[in-house]
Swiss-Prot record:
The gene is AMBRA1. The lineage of its organism: Eukaryota, Metazoa, Chordata, Craniata, Vertebrata. This is Activating molecule in BECN1-regulated autophagy protein 1. Residues 1-22 are annotated as: Interaction with DDB1. It comes from the Eukaryota. Changing residue 1105 to A: In TAT1 mutant; abolished interaction with DYNLL1 and DYNLL2, leading to constitutive induction of autophagy.
Length: 1298
């Protein structure tokens, strides 16, 4: 093989004729074709469709590159031949608009489409089709064929279905952590090795019918802690809330009788377990009696809520499904590789009479779960992994023989799939490694094994619901020695109180059952350990480089010595509703044992108490807090003080149902009114609200990438912050410290009040409160400086992808800045979001849903999953395999993968906030060596909705949505732009525009045309195709070489703040200065405070000399000879008129061409100067020019001799003034000009000759200066050039007084 030394097409073709085959020759020729066709003239041709649809949505190409499929608003799909442009097939059958369409990459003639009513159809162009409907008729958002397998991925709502179309329905489903996290896009790479998913980021989402709940002070600290853990916040209105409210309207109580099954794993259902030992039968019967005692009939099916349905119809088909036993426990050395076992199920459930017929082989018992227990850094939105077996730890003794029993006893207490985090894990970690990186499971469920499983059994779907734990605070099974008749609630008249009493009764009954189990078992130490597991899901951390494992000790149980006692994170605030004050108030529980501090030191051992009646009291922990004492003593039930569960209350501030505890002591408890009578609440709320707003602003101001840094994203490096962000950070720290002092003062007063009312318990109450009841603010403020070290590989990790961080390059234009306001007037996120919502509503009211979706605050995360082994993606985990954290997606055309699978193009929100926000087209690398690295960027407005990479991956096309009504008649309209990827990591210069795609528009059409999808034709140099909102399907092909287009685009692509000098003659014919503005154009210019350019000449105030205006732009600056003063004075009228006649026509033709492309032109005339700003249709081609007029006396002044230097030097002398204005915070337009008749100033005339135009530099990323609000986007790009004349010297050559 001979390597081609150079890119010489003639030699390559000559060698190919002689039979020589050079390596890479084919690719070089294809690249050459792409480079040459960009200079050719492109002609668009409409495809004649059968019934003239109103809109065209998506395009897809067949694998043989001969057919083009398009979806339309008339519910049909049309198949067009690419070469001839003729429609050859019409696929009719959808009841609503098909929203997505795709060809099978390898099977010819196979098309899949999904419509808005939840129907998926697979069409065979040779005849026939298969269809499947979603259960809830949710719209189909995206479809993806696997290139080699008979597999179709269906994205709908928050689920991804896996369908083999030879079956009647999908065989597996994975779900996100909540219904708010909708799946918007699924895409395989060209080889099918990796899967790309786009899922809504839940942090800025709300339901359609869910009101916005502000974050108050009690939740703000936990919001900050979740940000530290790099996990998404818990949704504040859990599904269980709706479920309990639905049950509260009934006269009956809570139905908890049936076996609760959690759709939590992706593994097939295991067979029923073997017969239980005789020691377990009494417990089972006791539990059955309890279940019958508290069970009530329900009449309504609630399966649509995503919760376990308890109605008779659904529960009749349910069978208890138990955890598999594990006969042997791995040694301590094998903890890191021991997979966890999860409770699994399939739907629909097998009836009891069919259980024996559906038994599988015993090998499935040991199948690991799809996703193992995830560490604390991602615990906020991970699986509720009900792992009661050995999860990466060894449990010595007979404990390993009872996981099924404990699971069976817990499961009926779970209220459907929303029992939150029953066994949430928080791993022990040293102080230096307090934030472990997220990880996926060591072994995932294989789709092939699922298929084999179902071939031998039923056709049931494997539903893997990783719904984030919300609702019930599953803080474990609190044990009590008392009957539990005390209550801290006085709201007996409310429905919540009745519901709470029912729940309290259930918990008390359940606690009695636990005491019965303990007395029957007689295994006190093992019971304690299992109880701790049920409460905390203690998981030993994999030893890190600086974290040595604790030596194994039989009496200390090293498997427990490195764990934490972790309460449910949803149970961090214990608030009760006080009817007297009509507010939720904090209860400060006291605990009989245990110490805690603000450090992250882990306990070294647990000491088992050999008392047969001992129980583990619940140790309340705030979120993320860990006890640091070396020994945690297990107190017996005979201790003087003990907690009691008195019920469950709904916390309106945090949106959680939370268990309420009270203290059982000899002297009784203190009432809520007495505890809170002296506590100031208003100032705390004000501080919390102020701190919340500051934190929200700081997050947006800093734009700090926490994944690539070892610092907390809330507290970034001050050197990288703007002044406004730095001020917000300091205020947050100050308010946090003040809140900590207030909390300590409140606790001191509470302790003093308790000691005065309960003298018997005062001896041991003080240390317990000071140690255990540590508030979160104390903990965070004291420890955040040592804990904010997130590992560099915390962003992306998977077994096959390796652990790395995609490199993010903070280019100068993407660094944080204070926004479009001055820093003291910087709006917060709430104001900014509100304005964007208003803009989005206005745009969508005009039918522009694509632009509205980009303006809205919705963002998506792109995750990259390894699919080589057909493992189900863990889409419930929002922090693993994240390729792009935030991007904008409108439809399947908003994201594209190159044909070679090496590049990914997507739209991401800009760090610079505006109204509306800008967007950035970002091209990322998918290569293994730099996966996730941002290579190319380009700024765009919110009307960029479609992106397509060329077949060779060297060009990118951006499709545009319409923004406004046409202001003038036009025969062509720009609908897309094509850019060349030329310099990686070059910022705005990394892409270079090469040409625009123009849509031929009828003369009577007054509206802009939007593109819904634009795609390159699959062969290099063939052309492109796009579909519009008018129903057109247009195929553009390069027809003929355009000789002047190369030179034209070279000139047009130069930066606007560079002065160009060339020898082109300005004597160029053009259009006349006839009036061509429409009435709407004139009205719009007046509305925004600008004077439209009139054909009449302006008269200066120095005389009656009529001046003709001369307009030139900064891009095509022409150098002219400076006329002599005498010549200029003798004939100013004729000379200026002739010059303006030629040069003005050239500028006018340029303005008309820009406006034909959808741009806008503003002209401002003053007494002595004229400023013109022309903005292209997309806002990234801005021309600003300034002209200073000369009166008849100018030429004879002595100062005119000093201005006879060549024009470029004059321009350079004038350039710094605009920068000085910007530094002072003044816009060039608002700078004070010398007006005639101004008191205290002598009106002086400028000394520049009429032939010396002044170009004005324009800084595109800047937001200073006046903005032309004539368009919806890019209004903060334009700087007026009116400041250029400020350097004009007076008659004595001195700078003029400003």
């Amino acid at each position: 093989m001979k390597v081609v030394p150079e890119k010489n097409a003639v030699r390559i073709l000559w060698g190919r004729e002689r039979g020589a085959r050079a390596m890479g020759a084919q690719r070089l020729l294809q690249e050459l074709v792409e480079d040459k066709t960009r200079w050719m003239k492109w002609e668009g041709k409409r495809v004649e469709l059968p019934d003239s649809p109103r809109s065209t949505f998506l395009l897809a190409f067949s694998p043989d590159r001969t057919l083009l499929a398009s979806t339309h608003v008339n519910h049909n799909i049309y198949i067009t031949e690419v070469k001839t442009g003729k429609c050859v097939h019409s696929l009719i059958g959808h009841r609503r608009t098909p929203w997505c369409v795709t060809f099978h990459p390898t099977i010819s003639g196979l098309i899949a489409s999904g419509c808005l009513d939840g129907e998926v159809r697979i069409w065979d162009l040779h005849g026939g089709s298969e269809s499947w409907f979603t259960d809830s008729n949710n719209a189909i958002a995206s479809l993806a064929f696997h290139p080699t397998a008979q597999l179709l991925l269906i994205a709908t709502a928050n689920e991804i279905h896996f369908w083999d179309w030879s079956r009647r329905e999908p065989f597996a489903v994975v779900k996100t952590a909540s219904e708010m996290e909708r799946v918007r896009l699924v895409r395989f790479d060209p080889l099918g090795h990796y899967l790309l998913t786009a899922i809504v980021n839940p942090s800025n989402q709300q339901g359609d019918d869910e009101p916005e709940i502000p974050i108050d002070g009690t939740e703000l600290s936990h919001y900050r802690q979740r940000a530290l853990l790099q996990s998404q916040p818990v949704r504040r209105t859990p599904l269980l809330h709706n479920f309990l409210h639905m049950l509260s309207s009934r006269s009956s109580g809570i139905q908890v009788g049936e076996q609760s099954t959690v759709q939590d794993s992706a593994t097939p259902s295991p067979p029923p377990p073997p017969p239980q030992p005789s020691t377990e039968r009494p417990r089972t019967s006791a539990y059955i009696r309890l279940r019958q005692r508290v069970s009530y009939p329900t009449a309504e099916c609630c399966q649509h809520l995503g919760i376990l349905c308890l109605c008779s119809r659904c529960s009749g088909t349910r069978v208890p499904s138990l955890l598999p036993h594990q006969d042997s426990v791995p040694p301590a050395s094998a903890r890191a590789t021991t997979p966890s076992f999860s409770f699994v199920q399939t739907e629909p459930f097998h009836p009891p009479e069919q259980a024996s017929s559906t038994q599988q082989d015993q090998g499935l018992l040991n199948r690991p779960s799809a996703f193992s227990t995830v560490q604390s850094s991602t615990a906020g939105n991970t699986l509720r992994n009900l792992s009661l077996g050995p999860t990466r730890r060894s449990l010595g003794g007979p404990l390993s023989s009872h996981p099924s029993r404990y699971h069976r006893e817990i499961a009926p207490g779970l209220t459907g799939s929303e029992w939150t985090r029953t066994v949430l894990s928080l791993n022990s970690r040293s102080e230096a490694e307090s934030m472990p990186p997220p990880r996926t499971s060591a072994s995932s469920v294989s789709l092939l094994s699922v298929l084999r499983q179902q071939e031998g059994g039923s056709q049931a779907s494997v539903y893997t619901s990783a719904t984030e734990g919300r609702g019930f605070p599953a803080s474990g099974l609190a044990t009590e020695s008392d009957g539990g008749n005390g209550s801290s609630q006085n709201n007996s008249g409310s429905i919540r109180h009745e519901l709470q009493c029912d729940l309290r009764r259930f918990f008390l009954e359940y606690d009695r059952l636990q005491e019965l189990d303990q007395s029957l078992s007689g295994e006190a130490p093992q019971t304690q350990q299992a109880q701790e597991m049920l409460n905390n899901n203690i998981e030993s951390e994999r030893p890190g480089p600086s974290h040595q494992p604790t030596p194994h000790s039989s009496e200390n149980n090293s498997n427990l010595s490195r764990g934490h006692l972790n309460r449910c994170r949803a149970c961090h605030n214990l608030l009760t509703f006080n009817n007297d004050t009509l507010r939720w108030e904090r209860t400060t529980p006291n605990y009989s044992s245990g110490e805690a501090s603000s450090s992250w030191q882990v306990p070294s051992s647990f000491e088992s108490v050999p008392s047969s009646g001992s129980q583990l009291p619940p140790l309340e922990r705030t979120e993320g807090q860990t006890p640091s004492s070396s020994r945690l003593e297990l107190s017996s039930s005979a201790s003087p003080q003990e907690e009691r569960t008195v019920g469950v209350a709904f916390n309106q501030e945090t949106g959680h149902w939370e268990r309420i505890y009270t203290q059982s002591s000899r002297s009784g408890t203190v009432s809520q009114e007495a505890l809170h009578q002296d506590m100031p609440e208003e100032s705390s709320e004000e501080d919390s609200l102020r701190r919340r707003l500051l934190e929200s602003s700081l997050i947006s101001l800093s734009r700090y990438d926490g994944a690539g840094s070892r610092e907390h994203p809330i507290y970034p490096d001050p050197a990288r912050l703007s002044p406004a962000a730095y001020y917000a950070q300091r205020m947050i720290q100050y308010l946090s410290r003040r809140d900590s002092i207030r909390q300590r003062s409140m606790r001191y007063q509470q302790n003093r009040l308790r000691s005065s009312t309960s003298s018997s318990s005062s001896d041991n109450q003080g240390p317990s409160v000071e140690g255990t009841d540590l508030e979160f603010e104390d903990f965070e403020d004291n420890g955040d400086r040592s804990r904010h070290r997130a590992p560099r590989n915390a962003r992306m990790s998977a077994p096959s992808l390796g652990r790395f961080v995609p490199r993010r390059f903070l280019l100068p234009e993407y660094l944080p800045y204070a926004g479009i306001f001055h820093e003291r007037g910087q709006p917060g996120l709430a104001t900014h979001s509100s304005v964007n919502r208003v803009l989005a509503g206005a745009v969508i009211g005009d039918g522009q849903s694509a632009v509205a979706s980009n303006i809205a605050n919705t963002t998506y995360r792109l995750q990259w999953w390894d699919f080589t082994k057909f493992d189900l993606p863990e889409i419930s985990n929002a922090s693993v395999n994240v390729l792009v954290q935030n991007c904008k997606i409108y439809n399947d055309a908003s994201c594209d993968i190159s044909a070679d699978g090496q590049l990914l193009a997507a739209f991401i929100p800009s760090s610079q906030r505006g109204f509306p926000d800008e967007g950035i087209l970002a091209v990322y690398s998918l290569a293994p060596h730099n996966l996730g690295e941002m290579l190319y960027t380009k700024r765009f407005g919110p009307n960029a909705i479609s992106v397509s990479l060329s077949p060779m991956g060297r060009y990118v096309m951006v499709g545009l949505a319409s923004r406004r009504i046409l202001l003038h008649p036009s025969t062509e309209h720009m609908v897309a732009q094509v850019f060349r990827l030329q310099q990686a990591h070059g910022g705005e210069t990394s892409m270079r525009r090469v040409f625009n795609v123009l849509y031929p528009m009828p003369a009577d059409q007054r509206r802009h045309v939007s593109i819904n999808s634009a795609r390159w034709l699959p062969e290099p140099g063939l052309g492109l195709a796009y579909g519009t909102n008018k129903g057109d399907l247009v195929i553009c092909r390069p027809e003929a070489l355009n000789s002047g287009v190369e030179y034209y685009w070279d000139q047009l692509n130069e930066t606007v703040f560079t002065v160009h000098s060339n020898s082109r003659s300005s004597e160029r014919p053009g259009t006349s200065r006839a009036t061509w503005r429409t009435d709407r154009d004139m009205g719009l210019m007046n509305a925004i405070g600008l004077q439209p350019r009139n054909p009449a000449t302006s008269v200066t105030s120095q005389g009656t000399q009529t001046l003709a205006l001369q307009l030139q732009n900064a891009e095509t600056q022409t150098e002219r000879e400076v006329p002599e003063p005498g010549t200029a004075a003798s004939g100013p009228g004729e000379g200026e008129g002739s010059e303006y006649g030629a040069s003005g026509e050239d500028a006018l033709s340029r303005i008309q061409r820009l406006m034909a492309e959808g741009g806008m032109t503003a002209v401002v005339q003053r007494e002595q100067s004229t400023t013109m700003a022309s903005m292209g249709g997309f806002g990234n081609n801005i021309i600003v020019s300034h002209r200073i007029h000369r009166s008849s006396q100018t030429g004879t002044e002595p100062g005119a001799a000093h201005t006879s230097s060549p024009q470029p030097s004059t321009s350079r002398g004038l350039l710094p003034e605009a920068g000085q204005l910007a530094e002072r915070g003044l816009s060039p337009r608002t700078a004070s000009w010398d007006q005639p008749g101004t008191p205290g100033r002598e009106p002086t005339q400028p000394t520049l000759p009429s032939s010396s135009p002044v170009p004005i530099p324009v800084s595109l990323p800047s937001a200073e200066g006046p903005t032309l609000h004539c368009e919806l986007t890019n209004n903060n790009h334009l700087l007026d050039g009116g400041s250029s004349r400020g350097d004009a010297a007076g008659p004595r050559g001195e700078p003029r007084n400003r």
